[in-house]
């Protein structure tokens, strides 16, 4: 009995040390910097056309389907804007992904063509759900799971990082030459769409470059009840944020106010 009590106390103490990654604050918004479309104009292949792919969710099946789309585009040849033959895949400027589709999008943004030699073995053909379940029932992870600062989605994010993303962050994507990747999740408090790009993180007064890709994938695929919500720190109001001009025009009044009757 004393041994079991000692074990429980030890697990609780260790669990109190576990914490989630913290998205860091920024002191000032710089619209020309960070991982956003406006700062990646040099990566747009054809200035007359913006080519966007949208990958939907649906678990591993969605990840496999979106991977098949990329493979097809890689094999398809077209005549590019310069008059030379090119791969259709190389004309893609933006990839939006949610849930299972976000894994493929983020991995392609990180690895480029290397994806086609590794993605199947490292992710698609693994029993990822089984591995998450095994970790959940492993005593090794119980201390972390008992911590109020670390949930089931953090457990999943750690696995995604180990098997696919290798510690990469959005800063690594920002330094790549690939298309802009926009992983989406849902704000559980409002039901609104949350996009992992610096435009949205400016609202939080936070630096997206330091956020691991694995956390974006975990947030995008966090099925309610099965997985916990991924928490982001909100430092809003501390970085002199001002809405961009296009947003002001969209949300502002369309004409002068009318006098009350």
What are these regions (language model features)?
Residues 4-15:
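Bacterial N-terminal signal peptides
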Residues 15-261:
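Catalytic domains of lipid- and phosphate-ester/thioester hydrolases
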């Amino acid at each position: 009995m004393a041994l079991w009590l000692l074990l429980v106390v030890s697990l609780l103490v260790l669990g109190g040390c576990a914490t989630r990654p913290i998205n860091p604050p920024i002191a000032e918004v710089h619209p020309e910097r960070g991982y956003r479309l406006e700062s990646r104009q040099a990566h747009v292949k054809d200035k007359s056309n913006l080519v966007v792919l949208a990958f939907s969710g649906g678990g591993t099946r969605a990840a496999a389907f979106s991977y098949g789309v990329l493979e097809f585009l890689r094999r398809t040849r077209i005549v590019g804007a310069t008059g030379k033959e090119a791969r259709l895949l190389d004309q893609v400027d933006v990839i939006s992904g949610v849930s299972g589709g976000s894994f493929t999008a983020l991995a392609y943004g990180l690895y480029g063509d290397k994806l086609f030699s590794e993605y199947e073995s490292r992710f698609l053909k693994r029993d990822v759900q089984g591995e998450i379940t095994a970790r959940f029932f492993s005593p090794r992870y119980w201390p972390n799971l008992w911590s109020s600062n670390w949930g089931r989605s953090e457990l999943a994010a750690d696995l995604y990082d180990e098997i696919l993303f290798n510690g990469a962050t959005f800063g690594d994507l920002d330094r790549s030459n690939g298309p802009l990747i926009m992983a989406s999740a849902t704000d559980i408090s409002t039901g609104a769409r949350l996009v992992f790009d610096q435009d949205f993180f400016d609202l939080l007064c936070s630096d997206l470059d330091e956020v691991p890709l694995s956390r974006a994938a975990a947030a995008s695929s966090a099925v309610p009840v099965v997985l916990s919500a991924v928490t982001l720190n909100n430092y809003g109001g501390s970085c002199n944020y001002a809405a961009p001009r296009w947003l002001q025009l969209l949300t502002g009044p369309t004409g002068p106010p009318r006098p009350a009757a």
